[in-house]
Amino acid sequence: MNKVIFIINDGVYPYHTGGMEVFNYHLIKSLSAEMPICYIASQEYDFDSAKYVRVAPLKPIKIFTPLWMFLYLMFHPEFKRVVLSFSAAHWLVWRIYELAIRTLRLKATIVIHYGKTVPPDHFSIYSKFFRSAENIVAVSEDIKNNYDAAYGINCKVVYPLIPFTKADKDSSYYRVKYHVPIDSNVIAMVGSLKGMKNPQRIIEALCLFDKEELVKYKPHVVYAGAGPMMEELKFLVESKGLSEYVSFLGLIPNPQIREIMAMADAYLIASDFEGTSVSLLEAMYNSKAVVASNVPGLRDMISNGENGLLYEVDSPEQLKECIIELLKSKPDADRLGRAARYSYDLRYDYKDVLNAYKDLLR
């Protein structure tokens, strides 16, 4: 069987907690139990069966890593297959990878996680990079359609699933653990607190609730994540007098996200765009009522009124309406949650993901 090398820099959980990083962690851990895997990174991970190749953490690490990969593989010809995760980075990074792939005649699998097409200014560089690959994987149908049309390629869609599990205690237990009001209606947001995720939108929506509505519906927002907008959000919450309606839990280890799902009545994802959101998948797995922004990558997973609710991404007014619709009728919210789980079971299976990658990397 071919030896496979994953190029991950430091971009894997637990050092980074985005969906791509969590997915790569579980993928390498699972595949290395069945096939010879090596990974190039600046830090070692708990991959029991995978070989670690250390790259010095020199900056800019995204540019230094492909150079290190080239030098390492020059002297280790037994590795002919490489796996790269494509996301937002300087065009020079992908140019270096493309030259290394062609020079060393590597069989590359490129996994596209980035939800938007790349800037048109460097079209030829990205086109050559993608065409140097033996396989190109897109993590959503929307990404496939965008990149196929832009670059004349044919991506294979493989969803970024991880092996989800459910929490073993009830909602009340975790609300006590995380100091969340027992009798509130919890709306959970999971992930990085940064601009394209629009974590402020739910605060803007809460500002539209009058006193009677806050008492009646008892909304309580739980942020499970950290990021550059954390302090800005805390200031906004305090300045609007909403501190009793919002909890900031900070960075939550991935295995504990199931606890957040267990105590949530609803899950909110407010992004400008997504590939296939790992946290949304986990919410669907946990039968949560979902509210999502009506954007590419999310409307492919959520059908308004069927397995969740959609709102226009820049409209806190619509978001408020969606929240009230969920909170005013528990039977309707439960129905949407069951439909979300049904959609998950119909479309997603971690074993299918592993088998797809094993087929690609044979």
Model-derived regions, located:
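Conserved donor-binding/catalytic core segment of Leloir-type glycosyltransferases
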Residues: 181-197, 203-206, 222
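Short alpha-helical donor nucleotide-sugar binding micro-motif in glycosyltransferases
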Residues: 251-252, 259-264
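Carbohydrate-associated surface elements
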Residues: 142, 161
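Short hydrophobic beta-strand element within catalytic cores of glycosyltransferases
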Residues: 289-292
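A short helix/loop element that forms part of the nucleotide-sugar donor recognition site in Leloir-type
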Residues: 167-180, 211, 356
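Conserved acidic donor-binding segment of nucleotide-sugar-dependent glycosyltransferases
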Residues: 304-305, 309-316, 325-331
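A short, well-ordered alpha-helix in the C-terminal region of glycosyltransferases
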Residues: 245, 318, 325, 332-347, ...
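Aromatic "clamp/platform" in nucleotide-sugar-dependent glycosyltransferases that forms part
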Residues: 272
